[in-house]
């Protein structure tokens, strides 16, 4: 180990500066040896304490507080630690260094690396044990085999899971092949197993014997192979270093890169099997060369020519025929070669002189010297394949590729066929390359590896595969047509494009239908349209896109949509822009009968557009749109697959696909492109690049100082059609740069490695890296259409008129007619909001500041600069064109000075155009008539309330999405201001590495009023409490949640006694709680302090998401309420009672929502004042909407329903227009666990069931159905899903139903209890149900399976009554705490006579003695007079609907009796 230390002197104290420049660098695979080397080195210098933390940091200052002075021990410690920090960091490879970027001391680096690579997790240990089981000798040498095993033994020991010696020996022996059986038998015969060193030595000796035998039987027959010459000479290379057998082999400087042992000889055990091959000497089939009669003659002739000189067993050998020279530019595949060999020095991209004394031996026994060694790469259509340790032999006649080294170094497999071969990815099986044979040899199809060009130079040559990828994977005929007609530079014109695996995977199709007979004579005469729905929601919440295809030119426009209802607005915009541009009108519009197109009928008739539709269920009649869908989707998916980009980026890929499709020739236009047909000029292909490849935009203007990097690796996502630039996504900072100064690496695809290596911490940083400015203008309505303007001075003029160019008198531009979504159709900038007080998010250049690069030489460098290339901006809105387009004078002055920096679009992942669907804004009436709409008088029509889809614009999922909308920005600003005002945290430097730093994220919610109208936008900053560790980051947890029964009881009492009910909301309730633990949190996404970006938040107050936050808030609230006289209920800890004389106040707490009621308005008002003074409380006054429950008070009582929740659920499940049914569950057939076909994806089923469970608050009529379907959540079937949809259909007909708390109620407590004996045919467990009434008010109900199988219906009913009595006993305790006294004992009605008698006396004890004793407590209550059990007829048993599905008549009868009804009229 070449490491030394220099001694520095500071204040007469030595400080060691350790130089570790030659120490083996840490990678992801050698931590074990690296840590031993580094720790031993520092231990030798007595500095190991700085690594393991035993040498602690002294205090920074000493002396008194009044006169502190710097501690010299601290200065020495800090300087020594920094030197060690630098030395250790220098011994870490670049790929690992980001993992320790947050460490500030050497001990933190050491601990971080230990946690990553030596953490004894179950997965890590299991992985190592699995590798040991799979580690077989195979073709490995004994040295390699033993080294792999011992390394894993040591790693397990490092993780604290060592294997004992016997187990290690067993692992070594069991994975050896059959030829080592003698050694295995010898070791097994010993009483005590030998050491691993002894086993290794015996295996080496046996390996030498096997090599000697195999070398004696191998005949030097001419073959195209490079192998290791094997003789009877014993391999002595291992003797010299046998004591260091388990050292790191990377440090063995004496070994050469190609010094490896030969493939093991496997004897043929089946001697009776005839030899079917052809003799290599005489050419006769049926015997091998070893048994040929001409063998002796052949050997003598070979020996007479030139006797071979002695050589070592590891000497490289080339068994090739020295015939006519073969072109040195061609590579030949050789399955027997162990090393790559080349005679062309240009084939080595990285090389070094060879200083060894070994030569390559050829078939005639002569040797050829080795001049250099190096490496290169061979390109394929998906990724380059690397060739390492190539031997450069000038005098050899062929370039040989070792199949073994090719497969092992690149993770591929090679399949040989009689006339061709294929190279496939080993993991996915996807073909990477296909080649053919030539002169009976397997020749690599590419002559040599091509250097990767990082420049966007039109003169750079590319292969057919590269052009195929650049042009979006077109058909081979189209590809050849483009290359031929436009004279594109191709690296090897004679080599024709064969196939593309990405195309084969994504472009499978059916037989086409017949062609349409419609003929068009001009653009826009026929427009075909259709909507496509994506199964995957994009990052910007796009679910659909709509296309418009011009029949005459086949030109396509694409707009992404969030809702299908946006089609009408989109088409109107599309029609106005195109008709104004081309000075012609749309004649006929062809589509299917979708509702989004039906909504356009009136508009079509008003504007004279003929609307043709396809017959029902016949999409083939809209074949042009359907085929265009297939073309777009296949091309887009192929682009994503080729670049390994997640499918959530489909709008970008589809936009680029349409951009390329419009520029590719099509046979329908006689190999003319739609672009050329529409604009009369040829497209420009020079600036096309491979979608998703690595790119390097010029980013100098964004550097903070002159030493920053001028560029960063980004991902190419498309073409900006409003600027002369490309779209470049930087993955680490999640910024989308728009730049014209870009260099490309078209063989590298960053996404393929980025997502796999993204850690949770990096994901948090990625979300937090968003920068935002309140002055940044964002588009408010942006379809995916390009829109440059002809008048824009940044773009070239319109193309010269051409005889074949239609509309040549119209200055037509093209860019906006493409479907690159980047910033198409940007609307006018939103007015800048005034800056609020308080902290603001980190800023970004505004739109004016972030104009794209200089417009100099746009005709040369614009990727979309095809003469008519400015239609995109000319088709943009007038406000945008006038505001954002600079004047010619300004443009000239700006471009003549210095280029402006590239624009930044803020979004991780890249943003699509923001669509703001404001359903609350009606069109402005310009006529003079006075209307209700002008006066703001709007009365909704109730008969249409159920036909309106309430799935409005969805809430954003990330801070990046929310920052695009001013309303969400304001909500986020309010939340941050509240946190700052409450002094929730302090910004501090990061704590030590062993302290958990909790992440945080934003939660966005729309708050609605009881009528469904929008109340406000709410943004909540929550901590990622799931990262907290119990006992370290928190101790106890509790959430103040009032029981639903308590709510119904208190509301029933308040309604009956005409008390006011007030609703409160505590602002930032969890912030009121004080933390007793030290909790550190990362800075909020979008609001990172630009001066201290690496600091973290040390929480002083609780925050939503923390494990201890609910309990901290509850303790704070409870302590205060107790000080002002409230008493905390024992029955329900979230209920508080204040009583002063005859005045009483009840308070119900559900986290931060509070209900308060009482009989004394003065006391109630004083209580509200006290709460407002202590907490930030929002008083909603009278109860109207609480926890998603709509409360409507009428003179006769209070109606509770969940109408809004039901409608949202129906809209989310697309069931709002479903045909209603009268019962939630059919009585037959009965559902079973195994009925129907199992769902492949149960996610939807489970989500709907979970949503329905919340409806039980006001809907006892669906309790049984929901409970029954909940029992199948672990394995739902299609039949269960249909039953679930039946509940939704029932709710669609009864969304306004709920429970009615009637005024003038008698406060008597009674309940109905029932059981369905053995009703479940899967396990024969009974179902019990009950419903409890306080007077006429239903206050509690349940439908639940019993715990076990019962022997009779009486036992089932008896258990049900016992459970009901438990609930009633709790209710009685709660009523007592509320000050309510019952005038008579509670009553339970049961329809089973035996169970009724059993509750009163033990007459059936002999038949019921197996019942658990705890069920018999009901007898004590009955005998003491605290409870009565009364028999009731089955016809009057109201709990019957809670235990089984009923017929329509019976269900409707019971539903009305149990209290589920519509809201009574006022």
Swiss-Prot record:
Region Disordered, as annotated, extends over: 227-270, 772-927
Q: State where composition is biased (Low complexity).
A: 229-254, 796-827, 836-898
Give the binding site residues for Mg(2+). Answer: 530, 592
Molecular function terms, GO-annotated: aspartic-type endopeptidase activity; endonuclease activity; nucleic acid binding; RNA-directed DNA polymerase activity; zinc ion binding
A family per Pfam:
Retrotran_gag_2
Write the Enzyme Commission number(s) for this entry: 3.4.23.-, 2.7.7.49
- Record-annotated active site: 334 (for protease activity)
Where does each CCHC-type zinc finger lie? 278-294
According to UniProt, the reaction catalysed is: DNA(n) + a 2'-deoxyribonucleoside 5'-triphosphate = DNA(n+1) + diphosphate
Please list the residue ranges annotated as the Reverse transcriptase Ty1/copia-type domain. Answer: 982-1225
Q: Which GO terms describe its biological process?
A: DNA integration; DNA recombination; proteolysis
Compositional bias ranges of the Polar residues kind? 255-270, 915-927
Please name the Gene3D superfamilies in this protein's record.
Ribonuclease H-like superfamily/Ribonuclease H (3.30.420.10)
- Composition-biased stretches, type Pro residues, lie in 899-912
Answer yes or no on keyword Zinc: yes
User: CDD domains, alphabetically?
Assistant: RNase_HI_RT_Ty1
Its keywords, alphabetically, are:
Aspartyl protease, DNA integration, DNA recombination, Endonuclease, Hydrolase, Magnesium, Metal-binding, Nuclease, Protease, Transferase, Zinc, Zinc-finger
UniProt cross-references to InterPro entries, sorted A to Z = DNA/RNA_pol_sf, GAG-pre-integrase_dom, Integrase_cat-core, PolX-like_BBD, RNaseH-like_sf, RNaseH_sf, RVT_2
Residue ranges of the Integrase catalytic domain?
519-682
Classification via PANTHER family: GAG-POL-RELATED RETROTRANSPOSON, RNA-DIRECTED DNA POLYMERASE
**Which protein is depicted?**
Retrovirus-related Pol polyprotein from transposon RE1
């Amino acid at each position: 180990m070449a490491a030394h230390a220099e001694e520095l002197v500071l204040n007469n104290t030595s400080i060691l500066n350790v130089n570790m420049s030659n120490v083996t660098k840490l990678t992801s695979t050698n931590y074990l040896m690296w840590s031993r080397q580094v720790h031993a080195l520092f231990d030798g210098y007595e500095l190991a304490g700085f690594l393991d933390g035993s040498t602690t940091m002294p205090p920074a200052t000493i002396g008194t507080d009044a006169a502190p002075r710097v501690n010299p021990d601290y200065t020495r410690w800090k300087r020594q630690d920094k030197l060690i920090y630098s030395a250790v960091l220098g011994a870490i490879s670049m790929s690992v260094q980001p993992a320790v970027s947050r460490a500030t001391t050497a001990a933190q680096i050491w601990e971080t690396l230990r946690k990553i690579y030596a953490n004894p997790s179950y997965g890590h240990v299991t992985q190592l044990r699995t590798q040991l089981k799979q580690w077989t000798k195979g073709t490995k040498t004994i040295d390699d085999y033993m080294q792999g095993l011992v390394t894993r033994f040591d790693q397990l020991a490092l993780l604290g899971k060592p294997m004992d010696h016997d187990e290690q020996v067993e692992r070594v022996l069991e994975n050896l092949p059959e030829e080592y059986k003698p050694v295995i038998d010898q070791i097994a015969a010993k009483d005590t197993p030998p050491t691993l060193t002894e086993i290794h030595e015996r295996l080496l000796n046996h390996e030498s014997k096997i090599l000697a035998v195999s070398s004696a039987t191998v005949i030097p027959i001419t073959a195209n192979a490079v192998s290791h010459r094997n003789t009877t000479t014993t391999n002595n290379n291992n003797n010299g270093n046998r004591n260091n057998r388990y050292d790191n082999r990377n440090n063995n400087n004496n070994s050469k890169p190609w010094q490896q042992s030969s493939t093991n000889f496997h004897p043929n055990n089946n001697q009776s099997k005839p030899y079917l091959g052809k003799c290599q000497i005489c050419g006769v089939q049926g015997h091998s060369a070893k048994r040929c009669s001409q063998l002796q003659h052949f050997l003598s002739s070979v020996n007479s020519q030139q006797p071979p000189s002695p050589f070592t067993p590891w000497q490289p050998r080339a068994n090739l025929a020295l015939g006519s020279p073969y072109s040195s530019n061609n590579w030949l595949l050789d399955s027997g070669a162990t090393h790559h060999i080349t005679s062309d020095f240009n084939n080595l991209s990285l090389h070094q002189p060879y200083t060894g004394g070994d030569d390559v031996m050829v078939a005639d026994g002569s040797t050829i010297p080795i001049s250099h060694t190096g490496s290169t790469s061979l390109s394929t259509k998906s990724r380059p394949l690397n060739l390492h340790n190539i031997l450069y032999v000038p005098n050899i006649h062929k370039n040989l590729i070792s199949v073994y080294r090719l497969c092992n170094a690149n993770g591929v497999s090679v399949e040989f066929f009689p006339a061709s071969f294929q190279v496939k990815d080993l993991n996915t099986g996807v073909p990477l390359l296909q080649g053919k044979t030539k002169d009976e040899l397997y020749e690599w199809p590419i002559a040599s590896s091509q250097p990767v060009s990082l420049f966007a130079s039109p003169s750079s040559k590319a292969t057919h595969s590269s052009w195929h990828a650049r042009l979006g994977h077109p058909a081979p005929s189209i590809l050849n047509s483009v290359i031929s007609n436009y004279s594109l530079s191709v690296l090897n014109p004679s080599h024709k494009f064969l196939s593309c695996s990405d195309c084969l995977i994504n472009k499978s199709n059916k037989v086409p239908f017949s062609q349409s007979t419609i003929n068009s004579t001009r653009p826009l005469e026929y427009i075909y349209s259709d909507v496509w729905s994506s199964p995957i929601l994009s990052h910007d919440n796009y679910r659909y896109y709509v296309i418009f295809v011009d029949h005459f030119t086949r030109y396509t426009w694409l707009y992404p949509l969030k809702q299908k209802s946006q089609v009408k607005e989109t088409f109107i915009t599309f029609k106005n822009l195109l008709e104004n541009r081309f000075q012609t009108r749309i004649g006929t519009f062809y589509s299917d009968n979708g509702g989004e197109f039906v909504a356009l009928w009136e508009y079509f008739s008003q504007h004279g557009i003929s609307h043709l539709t396809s017959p029902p269920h016949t999409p083939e009649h809209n074949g042009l749109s359907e085929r265009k869908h297939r073309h777009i989707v296949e091309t887009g998916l192929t682009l994503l697959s080729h670049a390994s980009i997640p499918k959530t980026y489909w709008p970008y890929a589809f936009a680029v696909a349409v951009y390329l499709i419009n520029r590719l020739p099509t046979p329908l236009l006689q190999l003319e492109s739609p672009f050329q047909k529409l604009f009369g000029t040829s497209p420009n292909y020079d600036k096309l690049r491979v979608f998703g490849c690595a790119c390097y935009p010029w980013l100098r203007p964004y550097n903070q100082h002159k030493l920053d990097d001028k560029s960063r690796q980004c991902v190419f996502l498309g073409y900006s059609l409003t600027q002369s630039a490309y779209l470049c996504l930087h993955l680490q900072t999640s910024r989308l740069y728009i730049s014209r100064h870009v260099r490309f690496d078209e063989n590298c695809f960053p996404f393929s490695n980025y997502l796999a290596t993204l850690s949770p911490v990096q994901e948090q940083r990625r979300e937090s890296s968003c920068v935002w400015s309140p002055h940044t203008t964002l588009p408010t309505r942006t379809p995916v259409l390009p829109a440059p303007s002809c008048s824009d001075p940044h773009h070239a003029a319109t193309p010269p008129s051409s005889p074949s160019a239609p509309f040549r008198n119209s200055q037509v531009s093209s860019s906006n007619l493409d479907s690159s979504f980047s910033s198409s159709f940007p609307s006018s900038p939103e007015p800048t909001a005034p800056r609020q007080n308080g902290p603001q998010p980190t800023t970004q250049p505004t739109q004016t500041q972030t104009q794209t690069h200089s417009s100099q030489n746009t005709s040369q460098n614009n990727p979309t600069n095809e003469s008519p290339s400015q239609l995109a901006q000319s088709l943009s809105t007038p406000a945008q064109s006038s505001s954002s387009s600079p004047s010619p004078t300004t443009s000239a002055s700006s471009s003549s000075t210095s280029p402006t920096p590239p624009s930044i679009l803020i979004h991780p992942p890249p943003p699509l155009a923001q669509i703001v669907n404001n359903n609350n804004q009606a069109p402005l009436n310009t006529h003079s008539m006075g209307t209700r709409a002008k006066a703001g008088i709007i009365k909704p029509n109730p008969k249409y309330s159920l036909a309106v889809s309430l799935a409005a614009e969805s809430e954003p999922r990330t801070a990046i999405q929310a920052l695009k909308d001013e309303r969400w920005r304001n909500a986020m600003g309010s939340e941050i201001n509240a946190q700052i005002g409450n002094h929730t945290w302090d910004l501090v430097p990061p704590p030590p590495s062993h302290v958990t730093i909790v992440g945080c994220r934003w939660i966005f919610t729309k708050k609605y009023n009881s009528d469904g109208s929008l109340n406000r936008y709410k943004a909540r900053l929550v901590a990622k409490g799931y990262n907290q560790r119990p006992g370290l980051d928190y101790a106890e947890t509790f959430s103040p949640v009032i029981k639903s029964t308590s709510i119904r009881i208190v509301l029933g009492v308040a309604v009956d006694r005409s008390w006011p009910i007030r609703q409160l909301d505590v602002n930032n309730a969890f912030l009121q709680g004080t933390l007793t633990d030290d909790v550190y949190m990362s800075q909020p996404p979008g609001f990172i302090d630009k001066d201290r970006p690496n600091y973290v938040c040390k929480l002083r107050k609780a925050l939503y998401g923390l494990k201890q936050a609910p309990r901290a808030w509850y303790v704070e609230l409870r302590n205060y309420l107790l000080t002002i006289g409230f008493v905390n209920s024992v029955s329900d800890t979230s209920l508080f009672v204040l009583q002063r004389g005859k005045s009483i106040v009840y308070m119900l707490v559900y986290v931060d929502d509070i209900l308060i009621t009482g009989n004394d308005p003065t006391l109630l008002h004083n209580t509200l004042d006290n709460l407002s003074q202590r907490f930030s409380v929002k008083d909603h006054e009278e109860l109207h909407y609480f926890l998603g429950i709509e409360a409507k008070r009428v003179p006769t009582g209070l109606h509770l329903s969940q109408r809004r929740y039901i409608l949202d659920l129906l809209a989310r499940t697309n069931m709002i227009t479903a045909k209603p049914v009268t019962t939630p569950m059919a009585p037959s057939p009965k559902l079973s666990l195994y009925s129907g076909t199992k769902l492949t994806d149960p996610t939807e089923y489970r989500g709907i069931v979970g949503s329905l469970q919340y409806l039980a608050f006001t809907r006892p009529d669906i309790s049984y159905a929901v409970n029954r379907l909940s029992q199948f959540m672990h394995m739902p079937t299609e039949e269960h899903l249909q039953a679930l949809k039946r509940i939704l259909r029932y709710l669609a007909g009864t969304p306004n139903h709920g429970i009615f708390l009637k005024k003038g109620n008698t406060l008597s407590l009674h309940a109905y209890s029932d059981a369905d004996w053995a009703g479940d045919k899967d396990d024969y467990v009974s179902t019990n149900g009950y419903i409890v009434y306080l007077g006429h008010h239903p206050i509690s109900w349940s439908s639940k399976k019993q715990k076990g199988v019962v022997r009779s219906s009486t036992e089932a009913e008896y258990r049900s009554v016992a459970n009901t009595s438990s609930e009633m006993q709790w209710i009685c305790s709660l009523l007592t705490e509320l000050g309510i006294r019952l005038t008579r004992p509670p009553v339970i009605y049961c329809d089973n006579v035996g169970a009724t008698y059993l509750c009163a006396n033990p007459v059936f004890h002999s038949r019921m003695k197996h019942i658990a004793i705890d069920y018999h407590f009901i007898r004590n209550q009955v005998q003491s007079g605290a409870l009565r059990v009364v028999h009731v007829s089955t016809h009057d048993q109201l709990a019957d609907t809670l235990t089984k599905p009923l017929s329509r008549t019976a269900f409707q009868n019971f539903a009305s009796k149990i209290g589920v009804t519509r809201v009574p009229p006022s």
